[in-house]
Regions:
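Short amphipathic C-terminal alpha-helix that caps PH/PH-like domains
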Residues: 29, 92, 171-179, 204
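Short runs of predominantly hydrophobic/aromatic residues within well-ordered alpha helices
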Residues: 8, 25, 111, 151, ...
Length: 262
């Protein structure tokens, strides 16, 4: 294996979430979010504290603020969760709340985007073949937009079926392809000649990493793969998948959190 798995949490943050590769994240966001031209962004604290100590805090995969003060949350999820859409909405509430001062009569806030990169299909999009779907708050009958301050974007990579021979230079489709196939590649395909792909391949190449980073990447990918295999085995053996998946995902998130803090 020459390149690291972009859908691994640790690797995704390595390729998209560092100051040295910020241009990759900016290009990705400009491709995913329609009618935007993000020039710069700032990576922010990924942990959001709940106002109620009895309620859950939130830890994002990626959180950034753009040059126009928009807040963007990016989540990468490999295993299906029955309440994933609710989780996405829950994440958005932290970014709305944190922009409004307690006791203020002014409830204005900057736009919030939650981008979900998924290795599964959500039930809410069943029957829709589109890889990217975008949701806003709209009126039921007229579909009039209530506000453009909340945007939920889902990228269901299972719906992307194109091979390298089908790519035509579209940057977003090229990113979909890389997210699904990076570990299978021996070199950067010629069709992926945009500067953003050169950076993505350079950062994700294992031999380009320092020894500590490479060790962390390999350990993280191996642990994630082993846990997925355990869950698949449990399913085959007739063990309740939900219980096994919950335990395994909890272990993955815990390991990712520890490694991200190293």
């Amino acid at each position: 294996m020459k390149y690291a798995d972009l859908l691994n949490d640790y690797v995704f943050k390595l390729v998209f979430g560092q100051e040295s590769s910020k241009d990759v994240m900016i290009e990705f966001l400009n491709q995913v979010i329609d009618d935007r031209n993000i020039v710069d962004l700032e990576f922010m604290d990924k942990e959001m504290k709940s106002m109620d100590r009895e309620k859950k805090d939130s830890v994002y995969d990626m959180f950034c603020k753009t040059d126009d003060d928009s807040r963007i949350v990016v989540e990468v999820q490999r295993r299906k969760q029955t309440t994933y859409v609710e989780r996405t909405i829950y994440y958005s509430t932290f970014q709305v709340r944190n922009q409004v001062d307690a006791g203020s009569k002014d409830y204005a806030f900057c736009p919030v985007y939650v981008i979900n990169i998924l290795d599964f299909n959500i039930d809410e999009n069943k029957g829709n073949p589109a890889v990217k779907t975008v949701y806003h708050l709209r009126e039921d009958k007229t579909h009039a937009l209530l506000t453009d301050k909340l945007t939920f974007i889902f990228l269901e990579l299972n719906k992307f079926k194109k091979g390298i021979e089908d790519l035509d230079g579209d940057i977003l489709e090229g990113m979909y392809f890389c997210m699904k196939n990076m570990t299978r590649l021996d070199s950067r395909p010629q069709v992926l000649d945009h500067e953003v792909f050169k950076k993505m391949f350079a950062v994700s190449e294992l031999l380009n990493m320092d020894e500590i980073t490479r060790s962390n990447v390999i350990e993280n990918m191996t642990t994630e793969r082993d846990l997925r295999n355990q869950m698949d085995y449990a399913k085959q053996e007739g063990i309740q998948e939900g219980r096994a998946e919950g335990r395994a995902e909890g272990r993955i998130e815990g390991i990712n959190l520890v490694i991200s803090q190293m």
